[in-house]
């Protein structure tokens, strides 16, 4: 019921105008699943031998799907089904199967479409064959934590080969072999750091302990139950 208009001026700047006061009417709104949350079980399946996972109702807006495109560039076996439009947004179910991943160089212009997914992408890269190079990720230093520094330190602690650069990480993967693990990772109260290392622990010889998982409730309150179910616990 709102009187709302969106216009783009000659310089390409969008102007959103809202005229109030309006009489708002209740509506049923179906919200697509978050691609950021979907990335965690998908990467867990990709790095764990014998695994296959289907995540349903994932939002596939092109501005948010960089993580899936880069995983596919690494050789990820991802299948899309039940593609449809929900609330004006493209949605699909994604099936991920264990895959032999290969390192890639991620173009900096892809970063905006997967900026929140880089922590779990780094985990995938640490298990891949060969070198993965990322750059243009300065924004990761000013998220809920310095995600470049924390991911580099954490991955090194569990046995990965990582070079931290000012605007990205260079990761030489394990070739699909499990990492050593067996250490406790500081999440720095960052939900994505905590979830990323929880997933990494699924493919480590001695597992991984995350010091504080409470921040996970910020974005994915059922994450621990989901990961336990996927692990057969």
What are these regions (language model features)?
Residues 1-233:
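Short, structured segments at the rim of ligand-binding sites
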